[in-house]
Structure formats: C-alpha cells, structure tokens
UniProtKB/Swiss-Prot annotation:
Gene Ontology CC: one annotated term: large ribosomal subunit
Molecular-function GO term, any one: rRNA binding
Subunit structure: Part of the 50S ribosomal subunit.
PROSITE patterns per UniProt: RIBOSOMAL_L1
Superkingdom, taxonomy of origin: Bacteria
Bilayer-spanning residue ranges: none
GO BP terms, alphabetized: regulation of translation; translation
Keywords: Repressor, Ribonucleoprotein, Ribosomal protein, RNA-binding, rRNA-binding, Translation regulation, tRNA-binding
InterPro entries reported in the protein's UniProt record: Ribosom_uL1_bac-type, Ribosomal_uL1, Ribosomal_uL1-like, Ribosomal_uL1/biogenesis, Ribosomal_uL1_3-a/b-sand, Ribosomal_uL1_CS
Protein name: Large ribosomal subunit protein uL1
Stored Pfam families: Ribosomal_L1
Family of the protein in this entry: Belongs to the universal ribosomal protein uL1 family.
Disulfide bond sites: none
Length: 229
C-alpha cells in the first residue's frame, strides 16, 4: 500500500491539476503516469451539463473505435434457428435460448456483451434484474437488439463500445490500453469525442461539456482541452 501511495504521489507530481492539456499531451501523460503492473485500460470521462430526467436529454449509444479497445469481448447471443447459426458463424462465444436464461439466473455471468434478436426479448426480459444493473441488457439504441446478429457480433468483437450518461450527466468509456501507441489512443479519443459532440441534446443549455479527462485504470485524472483539436 505504501509503495502504491508513493507511485500515486509521483504520478500526481507530473500532472498540473489546474491545466487542461491537449489530447496528445494528455495521452502521453496518461501512459507515463500509469503504474499498474498489468496492461491498464485508458478511459475518458465527460461531465455534461444535461438533465437526464428529461427524455430528450438522455444520452446513450454505441460506436466502433477505429483502433479497437484492446479487450477481447465475450459475446452472448439470444437467437434461434438460422439467426443462431449466423451468430455462431460470426464468432459469438455463446448462443442459445431458455438454456442461457436458466444458466444466467443460476449465477453465471462469464460474458461481456449480450445481443438478441427482437423475437427473443420476451425471454431476455426475465433477466432484467440481472442484466440491467450491469448495463448488459440488449437495447436497440446500442445495436444489441437486431436481426443482423452477424454484424452485431463482428462489431462487438472488433472494438465496439457502448456509452450512457448516468444520473449526474457523466459519461465514461474505454478508448484502449496503455500498450497502444499514443497516436492510436489519440485517434480513438477524437472519434469518441466527435460522437459526444454530435450527441448534444438540442434542449441542453449553457456549457455542454463542463469537464473532459483521460485516465488509466489506476492512474490520475488528466484534464483535456477540447478546443485543442
């Protein structure tokens, strides 16, 4: 614990908490100040001036990062017949129907993404209390309720991320790993930032983005100046 505290202090000394860095500087600092013993994730966090209690100010969606996330996603698909075969051919890790519902209700959660064809949502709905709190419930807005299961599986395996504003208007997302080249992290950040800019609700008032920062799994938060690119 003492060693970790010392590492954190050293990391904090490298970052000026009063300064907003360019995205290139922020990414470089994030890599330099990471002290995790594993290949930590690089994350972005947005504080948005929105009121998610209003239906037209809720922000939720999905996108495919140009350079992926560096994480191998375990994909589960609820489908039957030809669609189940399509999912398997596309590389889904688990495909099924009621058998998977029973398994999940029994405590099994060894998957990262859940996809379902529309006709399967009646049985998937039984898992609301399990999948909902973990942000795993399939949703048309994130492209996880679809008849094109092959595309959904391929995107999930190829760097697709989902995002959603919480009650306080905060949005967090993984944009890669510390091991990524800095330019790839910058490209991923810019792609996600463009999505966040376009997601601004028409009814939002005042400054939309009140804070943008980059951090690693065990690193320090580094403020980013959105006007730097």
């Amino acid at each position: 614990m003492a060693k970790k505290s010392k590492q954190m202090r050293a990391a904090l000394e490298k970052v000026d908490s009063t300064k907003a860095y360019s995205v290139e500087e922020a990414v470089t600092l994030a890599k330099e100040t990471n002290f995790a013993k594993f290949d930590a994730s690089v994350e972005v966090a947005y504080n948005l001036n929105i009121d998610v209690r209003k239906a037209d100010q809720q922000i939720r969606g999905a996108m495919v990062l140009p350079n992926g996330t560096g994480k191998t996603q375990r994909v589960l698909v609820f489908a039957r017949g030809a669609k189940a075969e399509e999912a398997k051919a596309a590389g889904a890790d688990f495909v099924g129907e009621d058998d998977l519902v029973a398994k999940i209700n029994g405590g099994w959660l060894d998957f990262d993404v859940v996809i379902a064809t529309p006709d399967m949502m009646a049985i998937v709905g039984r898992l609301g209390r399990v999948l909902g709190p973990r942000n795993l419930m399939p949703n048309p807005k994130t492209g996880t309720v679809t008849m094109d299961v092959a595309k959904a599986v391929e995107e999930s395996k190829g760097g697709k991320i989902t995002y959603r504003a919480d009650k306080a208007g905060n949005v967090q997302a993984i944009i890669g790993k510390v091991s990524f080249d800095a330019d790839k992290l910058v490209e991923n950040f810019k792609a996600f930032h463009e999505v966040m800019v376009k997601a601004k609700p028409a009814t939002a008032k005042g400054t939309y983005m009140t804070n943008v920062s980059i951090t690693t799994t065990q690193g320090v938060g580094i403020k980013v100046d959105p006007s730097s690119f």
